[in-house]
Amino acid sequence: PIAGSMVLAAILLKLGGYGIIRMMQILPTTKTDMFLPFIVLALWGAILANLTCLQQTDLKSLIAYSSVSHMGLVVAAIIIQTPWGLSGAMALMIAHGFTSSALFCLANTTYERTHTRILILTRGFHNILPMTTTWWLLANLMNIATPPTMNFTSELLIMSALFNWCPTTIIMLGLSMLITASYSLHMFLSTQMGYPLLNSQTEPTHTREHLLMILHIIPLAMVSMKPELII
């Protein structure tokens, strides 16, 4: 069900990050070197989740693994216990909550018209539903942290905090972000570009679907323009 996926990605997944933030308050802050294995595991987990996204053929699975990879960055940022890391983690949790929820909503819009979630079978929608293609483009740009979105601000904070703590982490972070851009582009091209493979009649988009996307994009844009609200 689409509602379950949206709530799971936007809220329940972030409860784990909130729990780690609360737990870190009772752990020693002066000796963060002892947390190095956990940080490496979090970043390596993010890379593996991103690589898993690249080989997905199911649209919902791809978006779900995308959420997992972003939470790896959040965990790494929280564990180093610096103000920048914590601010970046909180900002990324909020920004990615909106982004992944919007992507699940768009995936459901596609599924209702094609009755399949296989990427290769959902192509060609830019000719049929051009407005939906615009929403797909915006959601994917937010997913790859394009400026001036909140995702960009949060990933920049996380990258700065981790690089300041250990410069070697920039290799894993850079690799993770490169793969994120690759699968986001792959997802957009697979679902929107090319010629439609299904000959069934497609119903037009409803106002409620556009309203749902606007209610995802506008809060994220407002927070992007005034990040003091959460950072």
Swiss-Prot record:
The keyword Ion transport does not apply. It is found in: Mitochondrion membrane. It comes from the Eukaryota. GO terms for biological process: ATP synthesis coupled electron transport; electron transport coupled proton transport. GO terms for cellular component: mitochondrial membrane. Its main location: mitochondrion. The chain crosses the membrane at residues 1-21, 34-54, 63-85, 89-111, 128-148, 156-176. It is a multi-pass membrane protein. It is an enzyme of class 7 (translocase). Keywords: Electron transport, Membrane, Mitochondrion, NAD, Respiratory chain, Translocase, Transmembrane, Transmembrane helix, Transport, Ubiquinone. The keyword Electron transport applies. Its EC number is 7.1.1.2. GO terms for molecular function: NADH dehydrogenase (ubiquinone) activity; ubiquinone binding. It catalyses: a ubiquinone + NADH + 5 H(+)(in) = a ubiquinol + NAD(+) + 4 H(+)(out). InterPro entries: NADH_UbQ_OxRdtase, ND/Mrp_TM. Belongs to the complex I subunit 4 family. Core subunit of the mitochondrial membrane respiratory chain NADH dehydrogenase (Complex I) that is believed to belong to the minimal assembly required for catalysis. Complex I functions in the transfer of electrons from NADH to the respiratory chain. The immediate electron acceptor for the enzyme is believed to be ubiquinone. This is NADH-ubiquinone oxidoreductase chain 4. It comes from Trimeresurus stejnegeri. The lineage of its organism: Eukaryota, Metazoa, Chordata, Craniata, Vertebrata.
